Amino acid sequence: MAESTPKLSLLETRILGTLVEKQRTVPDTYPLSVNALMAGCNQKTSRNPVIETSEAEIVHALDSLKDLGLVREVSGSRVSRFEHLFEKALGVPTQASALLTVLMLRGPQTAGELRLNCERLHRFADISSVEAFLEELAAKEDGALVVELPRLPGSRENRWMHLLSGEPMIEAGAAGRSPSTGMQDIEELRARVSSLEAEVAELRALLLERSRE
């Protein structure tokens, strides 16, 4: 994303992340209708923060994303559907796109968490490959797309966050809320459960979408 491009809102990044996610996990529903997008954005699993947005807000955000060349409307259907132009617009490969998508949908994460949470979008061989793509995104000549955050006390890994919504604000009290090293395995198990819950939610959304057509 060029430096002159306006920074995206939370809803705009949520829409982009949802479009990329659903394209790869439930391709039969892609491109997405406004209703499907709203369901994906308001999803309770695999989302941080969880939001509650309206159809009107989705449509307004889609108009902004279309103006930025990040989304386009697809013709040929009685229901308006939308697809992303994320990888082309940002000039990133599918591996990097998967990482950015999970960061947009789930917030800051360690390389280990990203590898786990990206499994359904792209299966990375190891954490080193995740870190390599993150470092490329952080060093992009036309503007960094991710940043490595300071390591929190008790953590084994640094967290990463995307920069599509601007530079991060480091909270002074963040260190006091960091998980201990012994909690890492529990967090990974929670991530796996969340991934399974997301699959169930997507199957339900697919059935609902087909029932409306």
From Swiss-Prot:
Highest taxon above the source species: Bacteria
InterPro entries linked to this entry: DUF480 (IPR007432), WH-like_DNA-bd_sf (IPR036388), WH_DNA-bd_sf (IPR036390)
Gene3D superfamilies noted in UniProt: Winged helix-like DNA-binding domain superfamily/Winged helix DNA-binding domain (1.10.10.10)
UniProt record similarity statement: Belongs to the UPF0502 family.
Protein name per UniProt: UPF0502 protein Daro_2469
Organism of derivation: Dechloromonas aromatica (strain RCB)
